[in-house]
Amino acid sequence: MNKLALYCRPGFEKEVAAEITDQASHLGVFGFARVQDNSGYVIFECYQPDEADRLARDIPFNRLIFARQMMVISDLLEDLDPADRISPIVAAFEELSQQVNFAQSSELFVETADTNEAKELSTFCRKFTVPLRQALKKQGWLSAKASQKCGQFLHCFFVKPNCCYVGYSYVDNHSSHFMGIPRLKFPADAPSRSTLKLEEAILTFIPRKEENKRLNENMIGVDLGACPGGWTYQLVKRGLFVYAVDHGKMAASLHDTGCIEHCAEDGFKFQPPKRKKVDWLVCDMVEQPSRISLLIGKWLLNGWCRETIFNLKLPMKKRYQEVILCLENLAVMLAEQNLNFDIQAKHLYHDREEITVHIALKP
């Protein structure tokens, strides 16, 4: 077991490769990434056996920026017989089970990469899931409760109709979503599709059990670059009063809520009203990532907000390096002022050439 598979948005394979190589080296694990442009996944092969399992346990998945899923995989199963794909797949799982106890497994995902070519296999994968699940259950696997906080999900990752990897991810260190993609429904009354970015960010960064405590009707938010109101919509939906900062017009439906004040100002110059305690800052402005980082840092250092979610638009080249530089600069700014904070970043499904960052100041 010396291989990891990591899913990603097509076109971001090199960023995933750089990130997993860095994260592995921090743990003293070395290997190389197999990258195929626009494939939607990366294979990281460790030089030593069993180290992939260690990485799947010890690299905090929620600290990976560009990966949608992380799992330990077998060697590629090739030339599967269309008349019986199940037998060699079960045999490959049996080989993996020599090192990992699949009695604690609870779910099976038969998946493809998130590309147009791979999606042509989606109907097959859906139909194949039922007989494969039955075969794996006969082995005594997939019987654990889905709500448990330990154990594994089993994965069968098809790259071609008769070629797949089999593997597993750890329940306490993976994405629980099929293909690593949350399925969100666009609200009919939302002003723009960008609303899904902030909804996914909230679901990603804030535990469900804490959401009502951290986003509620007793709080005030600021949305920089708010027009037409996709991000403001998510805050208003959760009860916040929002200062929507943008020279452009806001959706009439948001004005009708009575929960926003439209401030026709430059987002870089706006300051929160005096004697108003702002809890949340959100920002989705099209600007250089270094400039947005400085703006967010200013708000946090001045005590103008306690928690923030914002987007960093990525350059055409050296995207991973730019992200790390921006995050490190922000961390240094806050640490120099002795602020305690938690920072996370993710290339969300609803992001494109951008990442979403969450920072929360702690007491």
UniProtKB/Swiss-Prot annotation:
One of its GO terms (molecular function) is S-adenosylmethionine-dependent methyltransferase activity. It catalyses: cytidine(2498) in 23S rRNA + S-adenosyl-L-methionine = 2'-O-methylcytidine(2498) in 23S rRNA + S-adenosyl-L-homocysteine + H(+). The keyword Transmembrane does not apply. S-adenosyl-L-methionine binds at residues 194, 227-230, 246, 266, 284. GO terms for cellular component: cytoplasm. Belongs to the class I-like SAM-binding methyltransferase superfamily. RNA methyltransferase RlmE family. RlmM subfamily. This is Ribosomal RNA large subunit methyltransferase M. It comes from Haemophilus influenzae (strain 86-028NP). The gene is rlmM.
